[in-house]
Amino acid sequence: MTDQTYCDRLVQDTPFLTGHGRLSEQQVDRIILQLNRYYPQILTNKEAEKFRNPKASLRVRLCDLLSHLQRSGERDCQEFYRALYIHAQPLHSRLPSRHALRKFHITNHACLVLARGGHPSLPLMAWMSSMTTQVCCSPGLASPLASAPPQRPPSGPEGRVWQAQAVQMLVSVSHFLPLPPSLSHGSFHTAWGILYVHSCPSFSNLIPRGSLHVCVDSNLVPTAAWRS
C-alpha cells in the first residue's frame, strides 16, 4: 500500500467518484478547465471540449475523463487529484484511497508503539476501538473508555484478575501489515488502559498466530483469558 501510485489510486477511487451525486457538473467543468490550463497541458483544447460536451451525460463524461487520465500516466493522475482537492475538498477527504492510506499509516504506528512497549495516543486509542474486528467479552457491560483504569495494577493473583478484567476489544491489524513471528501471540501487561502483547505462548489461545491485537480496558472478563 505504501507503493500505491496516483494511477493506482484513481483506479480504486473511480467507482466512488462516478457515483450518483458525488461530483456536480460545475465541479467537473472546473477540474477539466484546470487540467486544460495546466502547463504543460494535461488535457488539450480538443480533449477538454470533448469531456465538457453537454450532449453526453455527466457520468459518461466523467468515466471517460478518468479512463483517459489513467492511460496518460502518473503526472496526469497526480494533477487530477490536485484539481479535485481545490474544487471538491470535502469529497477529496472521503476518497477510498485516502482512507486506505490513513489505515495503513495508523496501524503501522500502532504496531511500532506496541513493539517498543510505549502507549498510543488518545486519538489512536479511539481509532483502534472503532476498528474492532473481533470481540471477546461478556455482553451488556460498560464501554472500555467510560472510566479510567487504576493507575497501578495490583500484583500477584489480584493483578492477574485485574489484567484479565482489562480486556474487552481485540483489534486486529493483521489485514494491513505482516508482523514478525515474535509478535504473533503472547502474554500481556496493561498501562493507561492499553494491553500490550509480548511474545509468550501462554496467550496463544486468545490471540491467533499471525495477527497482532490491541486490547482496550474495561470491566469485561473474556472466558478465554488466562486459560492454560
Swiss-Prot record:
InterPro entries: CARD19 (IPR043574), CARD_BinCARD (IPR042146), DEATH-like_dom_sf (IPR011029). Keywords: Disulfide bond, Endoplasmic reticulum, Membrane, Mitochondrion, Nucleus, Phosphoprotein, Transmembrane, Transmembrane helix. One of its GO terms (cellular component) is nucleus. GO terms for biological process: negative regulation of canonical NF-kappaB signal transduction. Residues 8-99 form the CARD domain. Expressed in ovary, testis, placenta, skeletal muscle, kidney, lung, heart and liver (at protein level). Expressed in thymus and brain. Disulfide bonds join C7-C77. It comes from the Eukaryota. GO terms for molecular function: CARD domain binding. Changing L17A: Abolishes the NF-kappa-B inhibitory activity. Plays a role in inhibiting the effects of BCL10-induced activation of NF-kappa-B. May inhibit the phosphorylation of BCL10 in a CARD-dependent manner. Associates with BCL10 by CARD-CARD interaction. This is Caspase recruitment domain-containing protein 19. It comes from Homo sapiens (Human). The gene is CARD19.
